[in-house]
Amino acid sequence: MAELLYLKEAEQVVTVAGASDKPKVGEDLSEIGVIERGSVIVEGEKIAFAGTDADARHYLQKRSGKVKTIEATGKILTPGLVDPHTHLVFAGSREQELTMRLKGKSYMSILQAGGGILSTTKSTRAATADQLAHESRLRLDRFLQHGVTTVEAKSGYGLATDAELKQLRVAQQLNNDHPVDVVSTFMGAHAIPPEWKQDPNGFVQLVAEEMIPQVAAENLAEFCDVFCEEGVFTVAQSQYILEEGKKHGLKPKIHADELVSFGGAELAAKVGAVSADHLLKASPTGIEQMAEAGVIAVLLPGTAFFLMTEPANARAMIEAGVPVALSTDRNPGSSPTESLPFIMNLACLTMKMTPEEVLAASTINAAHAIGRAKDIGSIEAGKNADLVLFDAPNYQTLQYNYAVNRVDTVMKAGKIVVEGGVLLEKTDNQRCSLATEDRGTRPIWQK
């Protein structure tokens, strides 16, 4: 019989329960199921009980076997955070572009001059799979220290069949050997590479007719994404790629209406996309159609913050009944952060979402955006024991005390992987510092 873990008497247990079948929308987004002085009991990899501490003690009295107690007094307990939009696997860095943008260059002008995504593509193509895996593990380590237990990871920095497959194989490897679960998305249509600049339709055909079948044949991704944007992929090109993806079992996602109102939100509704992401310039009609179709809006306030632009109109989407999720958009050009808690801060401060809304958007709704809501995203009996203890007296403090990492303990599938804010090495359960590129070391993980 598995040892029971008793997370005892947290100041608050934020369950976000009751929305595993469909995401929270409208006023329900603020209903996050807070249990004051609550406790959670974990058995093996699953949550066995969540409720008041008095009820937890009664539950334990009826059980036999060993019980390990983790004192949670003075802390709050939430579901493991879920990041539904990252560009995790890449090589290189683009810090020089920050100075370019500060001097007036736009994101698209940098891209069209061969920088931006194309700069990262050059580095990623040149990197070996081992190099990509090493750099990406370090990013996952930092995600974990910020309370993120599941991430989505897109390809899109290969922009050639072999390089795209390389990225996706690395993501699959990381899912197998790192505590953070990695859910893969194929995004060969992230930009037009230089060799196809004079024949963009030819590249679209390559993505749809060569890349997608190979991705599906190797079962390397669950979703297909496309950058539907002026100067990148047209609505017609985007629809063709997404429909071809659907034929091969890849569920559609869209980078939509980030820079201009371009019809991406409307296309997301038309093709039945799981999510439309960015949406800074989404039209009122597009928002209405997304609500009717149940398309999740994955909002990325960190990208708007870093690019110094106005964020998406989260309030209009929530009031229209669009399910809203939050994400870091971790990437080297427009959102170089692994701190989903900081993104939650930005959602409050720049998009006027409430502390309750951002918690739901970063847990259960984010889980819906990657098809994992039946297993993660809330604290309910039978779900995976992905949990975070924050060193905070209440959940409001997480958004009030902004840009501070208050993660104390992270549990993944019933195993403690972060304690006292520090990663634990699974092989001997000894504390180790966060690996960095300079130290060249990392925790050894095996699922």
Curated annotation (Swiss-Prot):
A GO BP annotation: L-histidine catabolic process to glutamate and formate
Pathway as given in its UniProt record: Amino-acid degradation; L-histidine degradation into L-glutamate; N-formimidoyl-L-glutamate from L-histidine: step 3/3
GO molecular function list: imidazolonepropionase activity; iron ion binding; zinc ion binding
Binding site residues for N-formimidoyl-L-glutamate: Y157, N331, G333
EC number(s) given by UniProt: 3.5.2.7
UniProt keyword Transmembrane present: no
Keywords: Cytoplasm, Histidine metabolism, Hydrolase, Iron, Metal-binding, Zinc
Record-annotated membrane-spanning stretches: none
Co-factor requirement: Zn(2+); Fe(3+)
One Pfam family this sequence matches: Amidohydro_1
Catalytic activity: 4-imidazolone-5-propanoate + H2O = N-formimidoyl-L-glutamate
Residues that hold Zn(2+) according to the record: H85, H87, H255, D329
Cell compartments where the protein resides: Cytoplasm
Annotated binding of 4-imidazolone-5-propanoate, by residue: R94, Y157, H190, E258, S334
UniProt xrefs under HAMAP family: HutI
Xref: NCBIfam families: hutI
Protein name, UniProt field: Imidazolonepropionase
Originating organism: Shouchella clausii (strain KSM-K16) (Alkalihalobacillus clausii)
Classification lineage: Bacteria, Bacillati, Bacillota, Bacilli, Bacillales
